Amino acid sequence: MMRRYRRKNSSIPIIVEGRNDLASLRKLSFYGEIIVFNRGISITSFSDEISNKYREVIILTDFDNKGSFLKDRFYGYLTGMGVYVDLYLWNFIRKHVPIRTVEELPAEFEREVEKEIQM
């Protein structure tokens, strides 16, 4: 799953909430464009900027209430502006990975790798 999205990120940007989320994805070898939302502008203004620049985005906000709220708002605004929003990775992580934030992904990924090595 991660390998697939690393490749996808080479041509499609990922939207995250903050700089620490960006750093976490870099630790997981996501080297494509990652756009940080938390820049002091409204969701509608941010969505406008995104829709003027991209036809498709991947949303990877946190998995807590605030992150879910932002995901839903981005999805509503961006799809209404004609942008295809990929939520598959967000939904997959939410369902299968016991974390609440994007920042926790690298540590969880390391734990999974260690489990497989020990088997």
Curated annotation (Swiss-Prot):
Mg(2+) 1 binds at residues 17, 62. One of its GO terms (molecular function) is metal ion binding. Binds two Mg(2+) per subunit. Its cofactor is Mg(2+). InterPro entries: TOPRIM_dom (IPR006171), TOPRIM_RNase_M5-like (IPR034141), UPF0292 (IPR022972). The keyword Metal-binding applies. The keyword Metal-binding applies. Keywords: Magnesium, Metal-binding. Mg(2+) 2 binds at residues 62, 64. Residues 11-93 form the Toprim domain. Belongs to the UPF0292 family. This is UPF0292 protein TV1259. It comes from Thermoplasma volcanium (strain ATCC 51530 / DSM 4299 / JCM 9571 / NBRC 15438 / GSS1).
